[in-house]
């Protein structure tokens, strides 16, 4: 049976939200999810940003290199330092949330700033699905990434912009997309496809990433000219 991935909107609910230290969310959907989160775990320096906006997270997790001594003293009850350097702060925060029993996790602020951090954060989604068996979504100001494997169905809408990033598939076929897909050798080859209707079906034999936009291409162009 194929796994189903729903659309993400401002009413989507998650067990926990992990706020990373990239560009702070500014679009309506990620901000609404952040404001209404059941549990907020900030990655290291993201705790500073969140608190400066008048909020207190449930936890701040990381190696502590972005926090001052005064900050650490003031918020010692919610700060959890992990000094090992084999993983990044996003992964440390993920492990923390999993240990709390959370399995459905949204990542915000994971993109922007340094591009190597952005690629690393996105790439970790595949590891989290395989190693931790969690359901995760990474939201940006424009859309959202999910990691998937095998045969899957993705909720969509006509004109939604969709990009596919092959990880290890030798077979990758789609139904409901404007352009035919295959097991892409390079990441750029699967970008900028488009949904024809309310569902995209993927038949594959491996892992891949999917990015779906909040708006259709036409809506995006209209919003740009407002």
Please name every model-derived segment.
Residues 1-71:
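N-terminal beta-strand-loop-alpha-helix module at the start
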Residues 15-17, 20-22, 38-39, 58-59, 77, 111, 213-214, ...:
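Structural motif
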Residues 141, 148-226:
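Long, charged alpha-helical interface segments
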Residues 36, 45-131:
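Acidic/Gly/His-enriched mid-domain segments of enzyme catalytic cores or analogous surface patches
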Residues 97, 116-158, 219-220, 224-225:
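Conserved phosphate- and dinucleotide-binding cores of soluble alpha/beta proteins
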Residues 7-12, 32-35, 53, 99, ...:
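Solvent-exposed alpha-helices and their adjacent loops that cap or buttress functional pockets
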Residues 12-15, 39, 63, 67-82, ...:
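Mobile, glycine- and charge-enriched loop segments
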């Amino acid at each position: 049976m194929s796994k189903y991935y729903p659309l993400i909107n401002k009413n989507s609910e998650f067990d926990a939200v992990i706020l990373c230290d990239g560009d702070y969310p500014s679009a309506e959907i990620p901000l609404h999810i952040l404001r209404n989160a059941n549990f907020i775990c900030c990655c290291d320096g993201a705790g500073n940003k969140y608190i400066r906006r008048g909020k207190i997270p449930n936890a701040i997790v990381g190696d502590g290199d972005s926090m001052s001594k005064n900050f650490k003293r003031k918020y010692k009850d919610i700060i959890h330092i992990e000094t090992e350097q084999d993983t990044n702060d996003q992964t440390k925060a993920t492990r923390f949330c999993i240990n709390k029993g959370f399995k459905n996790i949204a990542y915000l602020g994971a993109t922007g700033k340094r591009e190597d951090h952005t690629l690393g954060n996105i790439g970790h989604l595949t590891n989290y699905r395989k190693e931790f068996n969690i359901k995760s979504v990474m939201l940006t100001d424009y859309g959202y990434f999910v990691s998937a494997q095998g045969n899957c169905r993705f909720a969509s809408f006509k004109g939604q912009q969709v990009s596919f990033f092959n990880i290890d598939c030798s077979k990758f076929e789609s139904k409901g997309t404007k352009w035919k897909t295959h097991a892409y050798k390079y990441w750029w080859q699967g970008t900028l496809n488009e949904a024809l209707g309310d569902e995209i079906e993927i038949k594959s034999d491996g892992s891949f990433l999917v990015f779906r936009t909040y708006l259709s291409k036409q809506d995006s162009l209209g919003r740009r000219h407002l």
